[in-house]
UniProtKB/Swiss-Prot annotation:
Residues 216-257 are annotated as: Disordered. This is Homeobox protein EMX1. Transcription factor, which in cooperation with EMX2, acts to generate the boundary between the roof and archipallium in the developing brain. May function in combinations with OTX1/2 to specify cell fates in the developing central nervous system. It comes from Mus musculus. The keyword Ribonucleoprotein does not apply. Interacts with WRD11 (via the N-terminal and the central portion of the protein); the interaction associates EMX1 with GLI3. Keywords: Developmental protein, DNA-binding, Homeobox, Nucleus. One of its GO terms (biological process) is neuroepithelial cell differentiation. It comes from the Eukaryota. The gene is Emx1. The lineage of its organism: Eukaryota, Metazoa, Chordata, Craniata, Vertebrata.
Length: 257
C-alpha cells in the first residue's frame, strides 16, 4: 500500500530569510537581515492574474487575428471600435504591451475589421427588400426611397383619395343634372365639369355615389313587403311558364292560408 508522503512544515519567516540570504549581496545583510526589511525590498504582491509576463509573439498574433487590435492583453472587447474599450483596463500599468510586441502585432493585424468605420456606412439592399412592406420599416428613412414603400409591392397601400368639398351652387347644379339623367358621359359630362370648374373625374365619382344613394333610398321606401311581393310574383311567373297557363286572376302570394 502507498504510504502518504510526509508533510513539510515551513513558515513565512524561514522563506523570507532564505531568499534574502541566497539572492542578496554581501553588504545587504545576508541571512541576518531583518525580515521586514527584506520584505520591503521585494516586489509588491500582485494578484495571480497580473503576475504573468508579457505575451509572447504567438499569443500576440493570435489576439491580433480578432477584429480588435492587440493593444492590450485584457480589457479589450471583441469589437474594434475605440468607444468599446474599457478605459480603466487601458490605463492599468500591468496591462501595457511591450513595444516589441506592438510592432509584431501591427504587422499581423488584419487591414480592415468588420465593425470599422467603412462598414458602418448605410447598407445597400436589393430593391425587392426595400419594396417589401414587412422589411421596409426596419431601415432608416435615409436608406429607403420615398416611393419604395408606398407605390410598389403587392401589398402596398394606395394613397387615400382626398374628398372633394362641393359648394352649394355646384351641388344644386349636379342634383338638377341627376334628375334629368342618372348617367352623364362623354361630351355632356365634359361640358358639365367645365361649367362647374371641376374635373371629369370629380363629376364621375359624384354621379356614382349619387346613384348608390338613390338605390338605397328606393329600397328603404319600398320596405320588406314590396320585396316579398316581388319574389312571390317571380315564382308565380315561372310556374305559369312551366305549366303554360294564361294570365288569369291574380293570386295573393302574401296570404297565410
Amino acid at each position: 500500500m502507498f504510504q502518504p508522503a510526509a508533510k513539510r512544515g515551513f513558515t513565512i519567516e524561514s522563506l523570507v530569510a532564505k531568499d534574502g540570504g541566497t539572492g542578496g549581496s554581501p553588504g545587504s545583510g545576508g541571512a541576518g537581515s531583518h525580515p521586514l526589511a527584506v520584505a520591503a525590498s521585494e516586489e509588491p504582491l500582485r494578484p495571480t492574474a497580473l503576475n504573468y509576463p508579457h505575451p509572447s509573439a504567438a499569443e500576440t498574433a493570435f489576439v491580433s487575428g480578432f477584429p480588435a487590435a492587440a493593444a492590450a492583453g485584457a480589457g479589450r472587447s471583441l469589437y474594434g471600435g475605440p468607444e468599446l474599450v474599457f478605459p480603466e483596463a487601458m490605463n492599468h500599468p500591468a496591462l501595457t504591451v511591450h513595444p516589441a510586441h506592438q510592432l509584431g502585432s501591427s504587422s499581423l493585424q488584419p487591414p480592415h475589421s468588420f465593425f470599422s468605420a467603412q462598414h458602418r456606412d448605410p447598407l445597400h439592399f436589393y430593391p425587392w427588400v426595400l419594396r417589401n412592406r414587412f422589411f421596409g420599416h426596419r431601415f432608416q428613412a435615409s436608406d429607403v426611397p420615398q416611393d419604395g414603400l408606398l407605390l410598389h409591392g403587392p401589398f402596398a397601400r394606395k394613397p387615400k383619395r382626398i374628398r372633394t368639398a362641393f359648394s352649394p351652387s355646384q351641388l344644386l347644379r349636379l342634383e338638377r343634372a341627376f334628375e334629368k339623367n342618372h348617367y352623364v358621359v362623354g361630351a355632356e359630362r365634359k361640358q358639365l365639369a367645365g361649367s362647374l370648374s371641376l374635373s371629369e373625374t370629380q363629376v364621375k365619382v359624384w354621379f356614382q355615389n349619387r346613384r348608390t344613394k338613390y338605390k338605397r333610398q328606393k329600397l328603404e321606401e319600398e320596405g320588406p313587403e314590396s320585396e316579398q311581393k316581388k319574389k312571390g310574383s317571380h315564382h308565380i311567373n315561372r310556374w305559369r311558364i312551366a305549366t303554360k297557363q294564361a294570365n288569369g286572376e291574380d293570386i295573393d302570394v302574401t296570404s297565410n292560408d
